[in-house]
Amino acid sequence: MSLTESPQRRRDLRVLVLSADVGEGHVAAARALSEGLRALGTVDVVERDGLSAFGPITRHLIRDGYRWQLRWAPWTYATGYWLFTRLAPARAIGALALSVTGQRRLRRLMRRDAPDIVVTTHPALTCALGRMRMRRRLAVPLCAAITDLADYRLWSHRGADLHLVMHEHALAPAKRSTGARACSCITRCRSAPRCDHRR
């Protein structure tokens, strides 16, 4: 910015919020974060379905495979969850697979939207982007919004610059799983659900 340029002409901070349409929880979290950021008045928010960056095959496996598991074979979901949360090699293989399948499209998405900050509300996106961030293939800060009170080894990533958690009891496990140097709990953060008052 030149010395004669008015501060009001600065470009707003652009935040790219990436979610996944596998369940309303991820989408609702992205919507609440986006609305809160827009309310600041100085933030340009772009919302995307991040799963599309992994390509049709991986997206189908993550989204439709999850729904199939819960409906027809819940034990397979429980088994997979146990593997990814308890066994580091399984997490490493999963992270590598997500990085390989999504890295090129995710980098293309970054070039297109040119964000200053990226926020994710799904662990697959956090994993892929966190790995990219650690390898310096993502140049902007990464924020992971953790909307689950379950095992944080699945939801968090050491490559993320910031983790947002839902409850103060999540601070300690999140710190252990990420190696964070500082933790604090956000209070007075309000979100009003949308509802039809005519019902």
Describe each region flagged by the PLM.
Residues M1-I57:
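N-terminal subdomain of nucleotide-sugar transferases
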Residues L16-V17, V119, C143, L164:
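Structural motif
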Residues H26, F54, T126-A128, D151-R153, ...:
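Short, well-ordered alpha-helical microsegments
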Residues A30, L129, A174-K175:
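Hydrophobic packing residues within well-ordered alpha-helices of enzyme cores
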Residues A32-L109:
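Conserved N-terminal ligand/cofactor-binding loop architecture of enzyme catalytic domains
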Residues M110, A114-D116:
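Proline-aspartate-enriched helix->loop->beta-strand connector
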Residues I117-T126, G130-D148:
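Active-site proximal beta-strand in glycosyltransferases
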Residues R136-C195:
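Active-site-proximal region of nucleotide-activated glycan assembly enzymes
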